[in-house]
C-alpha cells in the first residue's frame, strides 16, 4: 500500500522545492513517484535536471501514449510526471490534472511497487481540477505549505475550506520561511486556529536558489548541509505522522482579525 501525500499551497510559495527535496530524501529508502499538478510544470525540474514534457502536451500529439512516454526517472530513481496546463488565457488550468490522473490510472502507474506518491498541487483555488487528487481518492493526506505572509495564509485558509468540504485529512502546515517578523509564531497560531499543527519549519537559504539554478535539489547539491538535513527531518515527520484532522477554516473577518493581531 503506497503512502499517498498531497502538498498544497499558494503559487510561488515553494511547494515544488519542498516536494522535490522530500522526494529526494525518501529515494534513499523508498520507491517514489512525484506528480506535478501545477500548470507551470516545474515540480520535477530539480529531480530530472530539466523540464519534462507534460502529459497534456504528450496526449495532444499521441492519444494512446504509453507509460514510458509519460513517466521519467530522475535523481535517486524517483519517478516523475508533469500534468501540465493550457496555454495562458485558454481553458481551465485544472484540466491537466484531470487528464493526467485519468491516463496514469489507466496505464497502471499507481502500482504496488511504489512506496510513496507525492502530488504537488497549486492551491490558490481548490477548483474541480486541482481537487482531483483528494476528490477522486488518489491521495490520503494533505499538507499545506505557507509562509507568515498575509496572502500565503489567506490561500492556506481557503485550502482548508476545500479540504473540509472534501472531508480529507490534513496532516499539518509546513512553514517555508520568508524571513518576516514573528513568522513561525504567526504560522503556528494559524495552524492552531484551523485545528492542525506545524509539521516542519524550513528557513530561507541561498542554497535553494543555487541548487535550482543548477536544476538540482538541495539534497543532491548540498547533501551534507544543515538545509538538506531539515528536508530529511521534514520527510521523516511526514512519513511517521499519524495525527490528522478535518480542518476548521476561519471566516474572512475572523482571518483578517487574526492577522491584524500581529501588526
UniProtKB/Swiss-Prot annotation:
SUPFAM superfamilies for the chain: P-loop containing nucleoside triphosphate hydrolases
GO biological process: nitrogen fixation
Membrane-spanning segments: none
Record-listed E.C. numbers: 1.18.6.1
Cofactor, free-text remark: Binds 1 [4Fe-4S] cluster per dimer.
Native source species: Methanobacterium ivanovii
UniProt binding sites for [4Fe-4S] cluster: 92, 127
Pfam families (alphabetical): Fer4_NifH
Family the entry assigns: Belongs to the NifH/BchL/ChlL family.
Domain of life the protein comes from: Archaea
Enzyme class: oxidoreductase
Subunit annotation: Homodimer.
GO molecular function: 4 iron, 4 sulfur cluster binding; ATP binding; metal ion binding; nitrogenase activity
Reactions catalysed, as given in the entry: N2 + 8 reduced [2Fe-2S]-[ferredoxin] + 16 ATP + 16 H2O = H2 + 8 oxidized [2Fe-2S]-[ferredoxin] + 2 NH4(+) + 16 ADP + 16 phosphate + 6 H(+)
Function of the protein: The key enzymatic reactions in nitrogen fixation are catalyzed by the nitrogenase complex, which has 2 components: the iron protein and the molybdenum-iron protein.
Name of the featured protein: Nitrogenase iron protein 2
Sequence positions that bind ATP: 9-16
List of residues that carry ADP-ribosylarginine: 95
Cofactor(s) for this UniProt protein: [4Fe-4S] cluster
Keywords for this protein: 4Fe-4S, ADP-ribosylation, ATP-binding, Iron, Iron-sulfur, Metal-binding, Nitrogen fixation, Nucleotide-binding, Oxidoreductase
PTM section of the record: The reversible ADP-ribosylation of Arg-95 inactivates the nitrogenase reductase and regulates nitrogenase activity.
